[in-house]
A protein has these predicted regions:
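Short, solvent-exposed alpha-helical "recognition" segments
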Residues: 30-40
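Positively charged, aromatic-accented nucleic-acid-binding surfaces
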Residues: 1-29, 42-86
């Protein structure tokens, strides 16, 4: 993952919109087939990216129960927000 890239977690999207937990994840699932990993989102696997996931959790960027994390790029974020806005 390019460290300089601005990313959004699903939790951050839920909270910024005042949505219930899981709303952004459901939108992501609907759009996932049209997304490209590395362009639209980054998938962090707990086995390989555990330290980064722990830092995201400590920073409050992901839900406490998150095992594997999804971070959306600007492009992915815009697509999810557009989907949620209908």
């Amino acid at each position: 993952m390019a460290k300089a890239d601005k990313t959004w977690s699903l939790k951050e999207i839920d909270e910024s919109r005042g949505s219930s937990k899981g709303t952004a994840f459901l939108a992501f699932k609907q759009l996932k087939e049209s997304f490209d990993e590395g362009r639209d989102f980054y998938y962090l696997n707990s086995a390989q990216d555990g330290r980064e996931i722990d830092k995201l959790r400590a920073d409050g960027r992901i839900y406490e129960s998150t095992v594997n994390a999804i971070l959306l790029t600007e492009h992915g974020y815009s697509a999810v927000v557009d989907y949620l806005d209908g």
